[in-house]
Regions:
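Zinc-dependent deaminase
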Residues: 1-17, 32, 81-84, 88-133
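Small-residue (primarily alanine) positions within well-ordered alpha-helices
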Residues: 10, 14-17, 27, 37, ...
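Short, basic and Ser/Thr-rich N-terminal targeting/leader segments
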Residues: 21-25, 71
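Short beta-strand scaffold segments in enzyme catalytic cores
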Residues: 25-33
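A cytosolic small-molecule/anion-sensing beta-strand core signal
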Residues: 31-32, 59, 71
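Short beta->alpha transition motifs characteristic of CBS
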Residues: 36-43
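A short, polar/charged loop-to-alpha-helix boundary motif
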Residues: 45-56
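Immediate flanking context of iron-sulfur cluster ligation sites
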Residues: 67-79
């Protein structure tokens, strides 16, 4: 599958967040062309401020693969990751992050900060932006 097809999967995941009145953001984690984790925002559903789509997709991928280092993974997110999610993506050693829309209020991949490619951190993610934005 290509970036457009995988972002469509993330968008479908985002729509599921509307079922429980959450912000419609979706994320899909892929390794070797196979989806290993997908999620949507569940902050309202779980009453959990950390239940962002990217974090939940990383957790699902780590469980599926049986490891926390996701150095061969690409994560597709419908919106630019926030500081918490960007930090989680770096901590998981994600190889590449692809996102759709920028987030001028909380974007931590380009708009406000560049956590994903900060050379002071222990890992830098490759980045592709604006897919299906």
């Amino acid at each position: 599958m290509n970036d457009l097809e995988l972002m469509h999967l993330a968008l479908a995941e985002a729509r599921r967040a509307l079922e429980h009145d959450d912000v419609p953001i979706g994320a899909v984690a892929v390794v070797g062309g196979t989806v290993v984790g997908s999620a949507h925002n569940e902050r309202e559903l779980q009453s959990d401020p950390t239940a962002h789509a990217e974090v939940l997709a990383l957790r699902a991928a780590a469980r599926h693969l049986g490891r926390w280092r996701l150095q061969d993974a690409t994560v597709y997110a419908t919106v630019e990751p926030c500081p918490m999610c960007a930090g989680a993506l770096v901590a998981a050693r994600v190889f590449r992050v692809v996102y759709g829309a920028p987030d001028e209020k909380a974007g931590a991949a380009y708009s406000l900060y560049n956590i994903l490619q900060d050379p002071r951190l222990n890992h830098e993610c490759r980045l592709t932006t604006g897919v299906l934005a």
